[in-house]
Every structure is written in structure tokens, then in C-alpha cells.
Amino acid sequence: LLAISVLTLALRTTAASISNASAVFVYNDEQSNEQFVFAYAVDSTGNDIYIHMSAPAGNAWMAVGAGSSMKDTLMLIAYASKNGTGMTLSPRIATGHSEPSYTDKVSCVLVYADDLENGNTVTNYGYQGSGLLGTMTVNAVCHNATTDQSKSPLIAGFPVGASDDMSPFIFAVGPGTVGNNNLQSNSLTASLREHDFYGQFSMNATAATAPTGSQAQVPRPNTANNNYTLANADAAYATHADNDPAPIIHAGVMCITFVFIYPLGAMLLRILNKVKSHAVIQCIGLVLTTMATAGGIVISSKYNKSKNFNSAHQVIGILIFLALWAQLTLGILNHRTFKKTGQKTTMGKVHLYLGPAVILLGWINAPLGFVFGGNPHACLPYIVILLAVIMIYISL
């Protein structure tokens, strides 16, 4: 009986043994001397993965995805929680080069342990210039995140040990603190700004998978000084610093057009009675507005909050765009009729009042766009410049 008890205890101890199997990827930024770290381990059942991920706190978010591209892949995206010191981990599905969408088919639970320093926190060491000095770190277990547990064969989940082949991964970080754009949210569906750095790497899934009968855990530091170093993974490749200028161009062109060009065209007609100059200036403005509108549509298609085109900024913008083309049509028809008859027309009256109304709507829509795009700080300088232009217009 004693022998049986000892054997039973031994079996339980074996079943509960903790595996140190893991793969660790580390990317060192030589310019900033900062690191992006991703380490993962797969449970012996193949159902769960345990992860450690960290990146500079100056970035809005950090992410890792399974596969060689964003096409139909599972991504784990982490960002600061609402209080600015904790972390939120959101599993999302990426369908291409657009903002990934949250999926409830994968559930992630944050893991806390005494030997995991600064786990699931944002450390703040102060500021340098416009950047936050510190590290954001997340430790978690994600259920149903592996390839063989994927609910859809089209979605690439995190690989489990099957061979010694290296499995591809992608990683990225969100934009920095310039303009106070850092994300702080408890929501798993929080809106993300486009990455400003991304790349690829490979990891050995077999080395990261716990042996049968053992329990995986969040990968611990693998150096004597309690840091992470590359293990069972290849160095980063195809890295790219990214800076999407499209939103800035869209906003800049629209502001220049509605604050300067359209009012200038109106003043040429009102003060100098220059009909042709008025028409040329307003047509230039319309061309610029059309280009900026097209750019806005492309930008909107990349983000979850804007792809349905139902925000106040987008709806007003589309109405303004249609009204501008109607204004051009009315202006041409009125001018042709007036040249023939010498009499004022109803079209001319509509044209007279529609123009200022559209410009006013454009002025109002700009701050809505700044707020919608996550740049409310731009509202103040915009309003100051706009008021100056209005005062000049009134004084003439």
C-alpha cells in the first residue's frame, strides 16, 4: 500500500511538472537602445499558449502575429489600460493591411507571478523630448490560439510543435507619443493607429512546445542578469520604419482649401468683381478638395471605426463634397444664362448662399476631423488661424 501511495505521488508530481520549453525573439533598436521582446510556450495539449511581450512604453501599442503577413492571421495586440499603468491584451484577426478586428474565439488571461518583474504594467522612467521612457510588459495565457484549434481554416493561429522547421511571425509597434496619441484603454476593441515600425522573424515551434504530461508557463528571462535573449528563434528581417502621411495630407489640404482658397475666391468676386478669377480659384479649390476626399476614403477603409462611413465628420464631409460639385454646376449654368439674358436667375441666388454655407460647414467639420482622427490638440491652432482669416475678410 505504501509503495502504491509513493507511486501515485510520483505520478502526480510528474503530471504537474513545469516545462521550461520556450522560444524567445528579441529585436534591439540600435538607435534608441530599446528592445522588443516576444517569448512564447505552447501547452503539451496544444490548446493554450503562454506569452511574454514587451516594448518601449513610448509606443501606443505592441503586437505579434502568426504567419508571414497580415492576411488572415491571428494577432495579439497589447496596449496600456485606462489608468495608464496596467495592460490590456486584445486577440484580433487581421484580414490584410487594415486595422485588425477583435475576435472572441480566442481568450487571453493576464498572468501574474513573483518571478515575473513588472508584469502587465507600464513602467515610466520619465520623458525625453516628446517620448516616454519606459517599458510596457504583458504576460498572459491565451486559450484556443493555436493553429489546430483555429475555428476557421483560413485563419493562421500560433503554431504548435510538429517539426523542427522554423515558423514565421510578424511584429509591429504603434506610433509614439508625439502629439499625445498614446492609447490607454480597457476595451478589447479599442481603435488603433497605424504602426510606425514592423518586421518579421521566425521561431521554432517544437522547442516552444512543452513535453507530453508537463505544464507550460509564461517564458521566464533566460539570462543571468534576468533579461531575455534570442533563443530558438531567428533575428528580425524585412524590418521597416513606417510613417503614414495620408491623414496629415488629407487634413492639411482640406484646411488650406476651406480656410484660404475658397474665401480668397469669394473675395475676388465680392471686392474686385473678377468673375473669371473667382471661377479659376474655386475650381482649383474643388480639385484639391476632390483629391483630399479620395484620400480620406482610402484612409477610412483602413480603420474599424471609419470603414462604415457613419461618423459625423465623414457624413458632413460627403455632403460638403456633393454640395461643392452642385455649386460648380449652378455657377456655370447661372453664368451662361446671365450672359444670354442679362437677368439674375434662381440658380444664381442658390449659388450665392450655398457657397458661404458650404465653407461654414467645412470650417466646422475640420475640428470634428481632428477629434475623430485622434488629434484634438490640432483644434486650437486651427481655430486661431481661422479667426484671423475671418477678421481679415470682415475688414475688407
Tell me what each language-model feature is:
Residues L2-S17, M203, T212-L396:
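Membrane-embedded alpha-helical bundles that constitute the cytochrome b-like, heme-associated redox core
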Residues T13-A238:
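Extracellular-facing/secreted segment signature in eukaryotic proteins
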